[in-house]
């Protein structure tokens, strides 16, 4: 039946930037979460200077020591886990590059759901 996805926060957040590139960055984060987890939560936060988009999942996560490696192009951290999972290993790289090109950033941390949290921050 596929993953369960929940979205919380305001109806929309506004940021300045290239719409297609930003859409692709967010889509990459959601795609990664749903590949490895059964539950995904997307939280939008509209702060005074930036919008935050948190994508949390209940998957296996990435240990802290390997999180920076996850941003390397074509990196697939666990071949045993990813060999039957589609993807090129470029999603996180492109998402972070897009965030930084827009004056923002992308960070990975532990998720309250037990897996990984990808936090995309984009200035207004």
Where are these regions (language model features)?
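A residue-level detector for a conserved hydrophobic packing site
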Residues: 22-23
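Acidic ATP/Mg2+-coordinating residue in the GHKL
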Residues: 57
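Short conserved segment of the HATPase_c
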Residues: 62-76
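Short alpha-helical Gxxx[C/S/T] motif in the catalytic ATP-binding
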Residues: 91, 95
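Conserved catalytic submotifs in the C-terminal HATPase_c
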Residues: 4-13, 113
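Short beta-strand/loop element within the Bergerat-fold HATPase_c
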Residues: 39-49
